[in-house]
Regions:
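Charge-rich, low-complexity N-terminal segments
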Residues: 9-32, 38-48, 52-109
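Alpha-helical and His/Cys-centered functional microenvironments
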Residues: 6
Length: 109
């Protein structure tokens, strides 16, 4: 994989930034604990002990997402966090969404 580093940001090369086929998504879902596809987006719900833990986790994810220049859609109420990943400019789930989902799983484990 070709990776460009620009001021602390990691940006995948163009051949790594692409929309995934249904078969590729299904294959990747088998490797992503807790994720499912809903309305064309990768989705996962996480539970924490309290709001502080949920918000702390969101901050960790935000820092990693910013490095990738790829940001989640999410919704937080108290200890619950709903996360949706989709690449709007490709109109679907992309390699970036899979990479961010893996990062989120690593941070949550």
């Amino acid at each position: 994989m070709h990776v460009l580093l620009i001021s602390g940001y990691t940006i995948m090369s163009d051949n790594e930034y692409r929309k995934l086929s249904e078969a590729e998504i299904k294959n990747e879902l088998g490797k992503l604990d807790g994720w499912r596809v809903v309305s064309g987006k990768l989705c996962r719900t996480l539970q924490f002990e309290n709001f502080i833990q949920a918000f702390s986790f969101m901050t960790k994810v935000a820092l990693e997402a910013e490095k990738m220049n790829h940001h989640p859609e999410w919704f937080n109420v108290y200890n619950r966090l709903d996360i949706n990943l989709v690449t709007h400019d490709l109109n679907g789930i992309s390699t970036y969404d899979i990479k961010l989902a893996r990062t989120i799983n690593q941070l949550y484990s």
